[in-house]
Every structure is written in structure tokens, then in C-alpha cells.
């Protein structure tokens, strides 16, 4: 027997639009300018699962049961009829001026609930809630930790070819919620995330002198890593996030330095 390739069929599942009571829908519409926040969060989950390549979210037009099923047991025969093997349901509402999402994951073939969770956060985090839901569903169905509630740090470029402006930027893994972390006054290169917290290290040419900087994304506070007479470059965090390894050039010779950024010690 000659095996030439593997064949993976994405799991068909249904992401039912999260239900929203009318009062909450109107409030979210005023706050976020969204017609239906339940539909929008469900779209985030659906797109994430599809992009993973492991799941095949079914077209909502094929659903036989109405989306407003947050408080009732699904009619599993209806979902099995459209070939769904898993089903996500839930609701969104305002509680104490915050967004609260409750969702359930159902095994259609077994006819039972296999996960139920709830999240409460500020309304502006609605897209992140969609990513967190996806992470939980992904882990429950695959056994692997999800990666959807993550962000990407990168160098954004703009301007003419002869005078490019480079800014340090961050965005969600799906390309939304872009935020610029620097103004573009100095060249920035090689940003690297700390694996354990919201710190970033990167190279910046302040007054044409290459230096390694440390930036706290949440507070916006940045600092130079070390006070060296020469240039520093190529920063990396250690796997535990407690140290920074970087290169240091002096008198045409390059050295490697390891620095504990929490204490400032080498």
C-alpha cells in the first residue's frame, strides 16, 4: 500500500447567532454602533473556526431551528439533519453596564451539552469575547490549546518609497483592532513579545543611535534596556520572559548580553 497524502475533513458544526434581548440590543447599538452584537460575535467565532482549517461552519440559512434557543434544549434531530456534529448557542446581555456572554457547546450526535461558560467584560471587548469563545471551543473539540485570543506585534510602514515611516503596531490575530505604539519619529525594528506578559522589546534609532527598548503595552511606558556607550540590537526574551538577550557592539566588536529586565541585573 502506497500512502501518498493525508486527508482531513473539517468537522461540520453550527454557530447559532447569539440571542440578545431588545433592551440590550438597543444599548449595544448606541454604545458600539452595531445592529446586532450577538450576530457580530458569532461571526468572529465562525470566521476563526473556518480559518483554522479544522472546522466547517455551516451556512446559517440552512438552520432549521430559530437562533433564539439560548434557554432551551436544541432539537438535535434538526441539527443532525443538516449534518452538524457540534452546535454553539448562547446569549448576550448588559449587566451593570457591562457586556455578559453566556454560551454552550453541544454534541449533536450524542445529544448532550459538553461545555457551558460565561464572560463579563467592558462592551468594547466584544471581539475579544468572540476569540475567547473560539479558544474554548477549539480546545474542547481538538484537545489542543486555542490561539485565537492572541495579538501580533509588527512594524507598520507608510509614506513614499524614498521616505518610509515605520511605526510599532499591534493587532488581533485576525487583523482587527490595530493600534500604533510609536509615532514614527524614529526607525523601529525587530519587535518581540514577552511570552508571559504585556511587554515588548524592540530596536529603535533614537537620535540615530540604535538602542534596545522595553515597552509596556498597557501603560505605554518605555525604557532603554541598559546604558551602553555603543549600540545595542537584536533583542529577544528568554522562554520564561524574565530575561532579555541582545547584542552589544563596541569598538567594532559584537558581544552578547543577557539581562534580567525585572531587576536590571546581568
Regions found by a protein language model. Give the residues of each.
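Predominantly a core beta-strand signature of beta-propeller blades
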Residues: 113-116, 176-180, 220-223
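Conserved beta-propeller blade repeats
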Residues: 125-126, 140, 178, 185-203, ...
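Beta-strand C-termini and the immediately following turn/loop, strongest in propeller blades
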Residues: 91, 153-162, 200-207, 226, ...
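Extracytoplasmic
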Residues: 8-13, 52, 74, 82-87, ...
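Amphipathic beta-strand/beta-sheet edge segments enriched in Tyr/Trp
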Residues: 70-136
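Short beta-strand->alpha-helix linker/helix-N-cap micro-motif
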Residues: 7-75, 88
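Conserved small/polar residues in nucleotide/adenosyl-binding loops
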Residues: 256-263
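Short loop/turn segments that connect beta-strands within beta-propeller blades
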Residues: 109, 172-176, 216-220
